[in-house]
Amino acid sequence: ISSHDSFKVLRLPYSNGQDARSFSMYIILPNEKAGLFALEKGLTVDILEKTLVKGVEVDVGTFKLPKFKVSAGYEVPDTLKEMGMKLPFSDEADFSGMVDSSSNGGHALSISNVFHKTFIEVNEEGTEAAAATAGVVVLRSFVLRSSEDFIADHPFMFVLKEDITGIIVFMGHVVNPLSTS
């Protein structure tokens, strides 16, 4: 647990077994019960990078985190085109190496749309993200120095991050853990 001016962060490292990657879920809990909006508004990439680092490990006293499920879906062709991926969406696209043209009457193919859907579910068994189980949360043992309570009884943010590369895989917030959107 690391404490900051207006929030605290709990890092939950995942057991990685044989995997060389190192994933952690970070729960960012505002000190104020109604402080999530202000926290998100003031959050920058620089603050996130400084906040989501392995800090001093302490024993967690009382730990309460509600079960939650968050999902989102959207169409992404405009975003892909803005990133320079225009050819697959055009009449000049050539998918002949992937699709037998006799199966589609010899017509040329192009991509008309791309849908992206993500979800993350956290419960007492662990975390499931993007239809693949990421692992089970395991608090590793460490030297007893102090104990701090972490009770997420009000809106909070979560970040799922690969710790070696620093890549953020998922990020979202929970306002009402009973809602699935």
Regions from the PLM with identified roles:
Residues 1-181:
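Secretory/exported precursors with cleavable N-terminal leaders
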